[in-house]
């Protein structure tokens, strides 16, 4: 009996210890569980945040690509033309109006617009202004500098040249107008003036467009001399370095898929400066000789008539 009492006394301290320790383990377990949940929540939240950031970057990149779509004047399938225009029309009401009235435009103009957003202002006023010329000079001119003139400029681009408007057919006259301005320092010869003269003198045919003869003997009445030269890197660089602008007739390539005239105005960083009468974008670039030379099928150098 006495032994049983002693065992009970020994068990009491152990029971007290357990009564203290068990709640502690429970509390620690609860805290650990809470912390574990917090860690998991944080991991999930971090994953959501990372995913959101990546999606935002994708959207921004996509928008940047849409806003900087590079376009040119090459021939495309009519279905592609309208697909491009309809895509742009989603964010530009002017394109919607052009498409709604597409029957008033030559197919070539719609094609050009699909490759050159800079033309939208010209297109928007086409029906009202076709056939009209709105200026008799090209603006301020500095002798020795060659202004970039665009064949679709609203000041003369609605004028008729041959079987269509200067915006479509006028790359040759527009190129010559740049050369005349730079060599003479005068601003009173517009692309329309040269186009009108070219047509009246038989330098334009509906089948072939502007004849090469306009680039040489045809331009003499405007106070400059044009001479056809053999294409070589030495010839091209010598002429430009001596202050003689060049006009090039282009094969299909970066500038056209049919035929086109551009002006070569100088050399910078050993590259060629180009004035393309149908593209601000291409005119803003410097061109490697090895890129541009294979596309040239005719080349003329110019100087001021004595």
Predicted feature residues:
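Conserved active-site-adjacent core of cysteine acyl-enzyme catalytic domains
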Residues: 27, 31-37, 72-87, 97, ...
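N-terminal Lys/Arg-rich, disordered targeting/topogenic segments
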Residues: 1-14
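Active-site-adjacent structural segments surrounding the nucleophilic cysteine of cysteine proteases
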Residues: 13-18, 27-203
